[in-house]
Amino acid sequence: DILQGNWYTFKSEREVEVNNLMNTQKYMSGYPWGKLYKYSVLEHYQFPEGYWFEDTPISFILAAMPLKIVTISDIVYGYRINPQGITATASLSKKSIDSYWVTELCLEEFSKFGLIYDQRAYEYLLKQTLMNAGRINKQHKKIREAEFILTSQLIRKYFSDKCYTKNEKMRDVEKA
């Protein structure tokens, strides 16, 4: 259903870093590029408009679907690191809070894709929580606190007491 190739990142012709994507059926990067998709996979999928980090659903939703994902080691994409781009400058912008809103949207749309709020989704949400916190780490303290409270509410709403992390490194996140 999805074929994912390897990629490299570069700042200039002299600064190139090749990603070492393992050839596995289970790993899919969150990037929308560097992949071939079967038409039916994206037939009803739409990137959320007006948000930064709109590619979050690729890993949050599509990776949770019962799809066959194959990776190949061939380099199929070159990603230029842009020091003025959203990824590099997001933490300085008020739009960085979009990372939370897209996460909330992903969880709201699970039923649209026939997905369940299971252990895999819970573990992903914990990892996404760290990503979101990193993206807003330069925002005012009140914004960071509000995002923390909203994230806590999401966890209670969708997972209540039915999931606990199996990842030792995520236990501190879970306790917070």
What function would you assign to each model-found segment?
Residues 101-121, 155-169:
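C-terminal, non-catalytic tails of nucleotide-sugar-dependent glycosyltransferases
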Residues 118-124, 145-149:
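Short, charged, amphipathic alpha-helical segments
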Residues 110-114, 133-141:
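Secondary-structure edge/capping motif, primarily at the C-terminal ends of alpha-helices
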Residues 120-135:
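Amphipathic alpha-helical repeat scaffolds of TPR domains
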Residues 138-176:
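Membrane-interface aromatic/basic loop that binds lipid-linked glycans or pyrophosphate carriers
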